Structures are given as C-alpha cells and as structure tokens.
Amino acid sequence: MQGKIVQLGKDTAVYGLSTILGRLINFLIVPFYANVLLPAENGVISNLYAYIAFAFVMYCYGMEAAYMRFVSTLDIGDRKQNFTVPFLSLFTTSILVSLAIHFQAPFISRCIGLNTSESGLIQYAGWILCFDTLSVIPFASLRMERKAKVFASLKLFNIVTNVALNLVFILGFHFRADGVFLANLCASAAT
C-alpha cells in the first residue's frame, strides 16, 4: 500500500512539474510576440488559438476518457484492441475534418472575421488539430502504462521544439503570425 502511494506521488510530481514547466515556457513567449509582432497579428493569433482550443475538444470527442476507462478494466477486448479502435477512429475523423478545413479555409476565414489572405493560418490550425489529436491516445497509453518520465519528456520536447521554431521562423526567416502556427504545426507533427 505504501509503495503504491509513493509511486503515485512520484508520478504526480513528474506530471505536475512537466505541466508547470511547459506552461511557464509558453508563458515566456508571450512578451516575445508582443515585442516582435503587430498588435493585430497578436489578436489574430489569440483568437485562432481560442478556436483551436474549442475545436480540439470536438476533435477528441471524449475518446481519451473512453480509452482510459476500457483499458483500465479490459471489460471489452484486450490492450491492443483498446488502443487500435480509438486511435483509428480519431485518425480517420481528424484527417477528414482537417482536409475539410484545409479546402474550406477561405470560407472559414470569412466566418470568423479574418481576411481571406489569412486563410493559410486556418489551414495550419486544421493540421495542428489533426496532429495534436493523433497524439491523444498514445499519450493516454503512456499514462496508463505509468511511463510518466517518457510522457513528460515528450510533452516538454513538443514545447521546446515549438518555442525554438518560433524563434527561428520569426527572427531568422522573418515570418509573421504564420511563423507562430507553422512552428506549432512542426512541433505537433514531431510528437
């Protein structure tokens, strides 16, 4: 019993510290954006990330919780089936919805108050959602297998990659708001 409590404490510390560190790193990039990008660009970035947060919930449609429930009890199927079914479901719907977003980006841009010239940002957002969704079940699997250090390392790798690519794209290649989303897309695809 005491061993399980100690293990829970260690896992909680790893998950908690990695989450806090990740948020701190992401928080530190906000002043960079404020000093390098125009206020209008920061507004577009903020609005689009708000839409991404809402859309991510719909992209995942509760599959992470369902996966964790079924894999913890194995009421139906074995571990492999309990991984494959939700992953393929999310894979299929993510690809289809992201393709729809990609091809309807000018229309979506107008609907949310962006210029059609900014429809590339919508396309980036659609693919960010796709790649982030594809990582949901593998990350849940790491949690269920109690691989907290691997989980935290991959999450931090994603954040550090995102921040580093932001610096490269914005400072090195002089991208604007598109550099923010391209960096996020590359980081999401890498993890």
Residue ranges, per PLM feature:
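Transmembrane-helix boundary and interhelical linker motifs in polytopic inner-membrane proteins
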Residues: 2-6, 37-39, 55-90, 108-109, ...
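Hydrophobic alpha-helical transmembrane segments
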Residues: 122-126, 152-191
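Small-residue-rich midsections of specific transmembrane alpha-helices
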Residues: 19, 25-29, 46-72, 90, ...
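Interfacial/gating helices of multi-pass transporter permease domains
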Residues: 30-54, 118-120, 177-182
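N-terminal membrane topogenesis motif
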Residues: 1-27, 83-84, 88
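Helix-terminus/linker motif at the lipid-water interface of multi-pass membrane proteins
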Residues: 25-41, 109-112, 168-173
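Residue-level recognition of pore/gate-forming positions within transmembrane alpha-helices
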Residues: 19, 23, 50-53, 90, ...
